[in-house]
UniProtKB/Swiss-Prot annotation:
Keywords: Acetylation, Apoptosis, Isomerase, Mitochondrion, Necrosis, Rotamase, S-nitrosylation, Transit peptide. The keyword Mitochondrion applies. The keyword Isomerase applies. It catalyses: [protein]-peptidylproline (omega=180) = [protein]-peptidylproline (omega=0). One of its GO terms (biological process) is negative regulation of oxidative phosphorylation uncoupler activity. Belongs to the cyclophilin-type PPIase family. Acetylated at Lys-167; deacetylated at Lys-167 by SIRT3. It comes from Homo sapiens. This is Peptidyl-prolyl cis-trans isomerase F, mitochondrial.
Length: 207
């Protein structure tokens, strides 16, 4: 089963194991630096979008810059899954796991529950690098089931999550629509179960 980790412990996608405290680390202020995916933008980096609704009601659009200048393989995977050019991708999939004051997770377009998904390179692909860090809200990072198990599942942070540095590959950040991410977050719970069905109704590439 795919999972996020908190330190050396797994945070299961469908439920939080008893060994994991329900209280997550408090939000911390972030400082701009070389590991911040939003600290500098390259004109060559792709901009993609996710249009999201909750129980059929539009929430808005999230625009993401993919850091192809730092993690080109990971960025290309996400870009192609947004456009659907490989014949599969994120359109119609859900944000299946949302934990307030932590993150919003999506990308399982096969099983829609956190147990599936696949990359454009096959089932899984290796961690590219850990240059970019989980510095604060809006960071875009890959979910995994351990080292070198990247597929299609991803998460958008709503706080600084530096305990995930070196364990999950950061590959982008929110350029526009953080208010939409906060709306998604509002439908989450400590267990990750959402109170409404949150669907990526459309997605693609802007530039």
């Amino acid at each position: 089963m795919l999972a996020l980790r908190c330190g050396s412990r797994w945070l299961g996608l469908l439920s939080v194991p008893r060994s994991v405290p329900l209280r997550l680390p408090a939000a911390r202020a972030c400082s701009k630096g070389s590991g911040d995916p939003s600290s500098s933008s390259s004109s060559g980096n792709p901009l993609v979008y996710l249009d999201v609704d909750a129980n059929g009601k539009p929430l808005g659009r999230v625009v993401l810059e993919l850091k192809a200048d730092v993690v080109p393989k990971t960025a290309e995977n996400f870009r192609a899954l947004c456009t659907g050019e490989k014949g599969f991708g994120y359109k119609g999939s859900t944000f299946h796991r949302v934990i307030p004051s932590f993150m919003c997770q999506a990308g399982d377009f096969t099983n829609h529950n956190g147990t599936g998904g696949k990359s454009i390179y096959g089932s899984r692909f290796p961690d590219e690098n850990f240059t970019l860090k989980h510095v604060g809200p809006g960071v875009l990072s890959m979910a995994n089931a351990g080292p070198n198990t990247n597929g299609s599942q991803f998460f958008i942070c709503t706080i600084k999550t530096d305990w995930l540095d070196g364990k999950h590959v950061v590959f982008g950040h929110v350029k526009e629509g953080m208010d939409v991410v906060k709306k998604i977050e509002s439908f989450g719970s400590k267990s990750g179960r959402t109170s409404k069905k949150i669907v990526i109704t459309d997605c693609g590439q802007l530039s």
